[in-house]
Amino acid sequence: MGDAIGFVVVGLGMGRNRARMVKRTEGAKLVGVADINEERAQKVAEELGCEWHTDFRTFLDRPDVHVVWVMTPSGLHADIAVPSLEAGKHVIVTKPMEVTLERADAMIETAERNKRLLLVDFDMRYLKGAWQIRQAVAEGLFGKLILLEGRLKWFRSQEYYSKSGWRGTWRYDGGGSLAN
């Protein structure tokens, strides 16, 4: 696997699923994972057979790391993306890109200045239902569309917000269910 693209996944809440995806993707190599929760980082690393650290910066000087995948709370994306881009790594961030325009712009500017790729992972676009709608529209099932509106009802209990400490906050989630 000498030509494999080396990944580090930062933030192992939902990020553990992304790490598993990288692990089973041909042409990709999961070099490591990082999380501020040492026990979680170690557990995921042991499961997937990779290195772990509590500080993502530990991976930034490594030539075998090409991509940093940021899966932290939304309001922390720039804190990880900007130094990763400065270190010459490509970056994928989960949606939303960030919680303020200024922080998102800083990420874009850093990527452009360092000639690195910055991608936003809008994972819901790949759900089966989304693809079925796309296919139906492409096949003209609804005729010529002028406007399409959709609604997604997604219930989140108070426990969902309370157990994380960051979900639903303006600082780290950008407005809760309105943004994420």
Predicted regions and their residues:
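N-terminal Rossmann-like dinucleotide-binding module
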Residues: 1-47
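Conserved acidic residues
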Residues: 31, 64-66
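Short, conserved SAM-binding/catalytic segment
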Residues: 43-50, 107-111
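Conserved SAM-binding strand-loop segment of SAM-dependent methyltransferases
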Residues: 49-58
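Predominantly a Rossmann-like dinucleotide-binding segment in NAD(P)-dependent oxidoreductases
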Residues: 124-180
